[in-house]
């Protein structure tokens, strides 16, 4: 199924509506409470809409995203709340335009207590919440008790970032040196193992990929070819640009590989069918006339939901 006109700012409403429906279903008389759905929210950092294999890209392979899109709903026209990371994420978790959140909608500013993200509502209703990687950032959160107006803790939930990759060793499993050290999947598994039996969960998987800086030429050892690339018309069609886009693709695939592992894990423990899975990006690719610009490749992002 394909929906063509749903902007990203309505994600919050859709999530809360689904969760609220589950909560209300368990409050009628003396009926057995309905099992509330889990939520896995996966958001990449700087990825344009065209760059998934489900969308037809020839140089990006995203089996994790494709699985969600194939089994659920794929949105062909989803637009981020901003072409920049922090404002877009602020809009997403509050359901408001980022400028309505004042400084809590501005890049690297302070997050004020008055702006309540939906994760707080989920936690208050009994959900187990957490995040790994990049949360609702970059923002400044309360550093000490003197920051009385600032929020204490990330607006994505409680951090689970213990597990890391070791760099510059022979067993470094990362496919490019520019990839972050956070082991997203292992942190998600740790989160799940600490959950109480039967407790519904909400988990924010925030990959730091495919944000720059890239390892130049990483595509060469990852089985990619310059002739695979579809260069957007606003960029020069040169070997340099094609190689840069392939390095970008390597990082998208890394983030997607962790999503695939999370889906497999949920399937193995019998929770996938009761989990709302949302996969998207905050804004477009980090290239000229894309990220930080209100052109199509700056705000048009991938978006798929399955349940």
Where would I find each of the regions flagged by the language model?
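Formylglycine-dependent sulfatase
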Residues: 2-3, 7, 15, 19-307
């Amino acid at each position: 199924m394909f929906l063509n006109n749903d902007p990203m700012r309505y994600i919050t409403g859709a999530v809360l509506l689904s969760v609220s429906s589950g909560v209300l279903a368990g409050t009628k008389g003396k009926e057995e409470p309905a099992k509330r759905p889990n939520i896995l929210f996966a958001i990449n950092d700087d990825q344009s809409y065209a760059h998934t294999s489900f969308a037809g890209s020839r140089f990006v392979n995203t089996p994790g995203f494709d699985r969600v899109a194939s089994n659920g709903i794929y949105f062909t026209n989803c637009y981020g709340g901003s072409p920049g990371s922090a404002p877009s994420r602020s809009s997403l978790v509050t359901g408001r335009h980022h400028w309505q959140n004042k400084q809590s909608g501005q890049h690297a500013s302070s997050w004020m207590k008055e702006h309540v993200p939906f994760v707080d509502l989920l936690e208050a209703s009994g959900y187990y919440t957490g995040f790994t990687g990049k949360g609702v950032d970059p923002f400044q959160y309360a550093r000490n008790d003197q920051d009385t107006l600032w929020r204490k803790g990330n607006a994505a939930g409680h951090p689970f970032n213990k597990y890391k990759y070791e760099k510059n060793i022979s067993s470094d499993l990362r496919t490019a040196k520019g990839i972050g050290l956070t082991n997203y999947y292992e942190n998600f598994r740790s989160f799940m193992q600490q959950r109480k039996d039967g407790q519904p969960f909400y988990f924010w998987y925030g990959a730091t990929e495919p944000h720059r800086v890239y390892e130049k030429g990483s595509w060469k050892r990852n089985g990619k070819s310059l002739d695979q690339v579809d260069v957007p018309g606003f960029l020069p069609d040169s070997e340099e640009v094609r190689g840069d886009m392939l390095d970008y693709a390597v990082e998208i695939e890394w983030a997607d590989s962790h999503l695939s592992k999370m889906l497999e894990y949920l399937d193995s423990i019998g929770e996938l069918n009761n989990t709302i899975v949302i996969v998207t990006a905050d804004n477009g690719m980090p290239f000229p006339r894309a990220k930080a610009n209100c052109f199509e490749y700056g705000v048009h992002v991938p978006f798929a939901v399955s349940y």
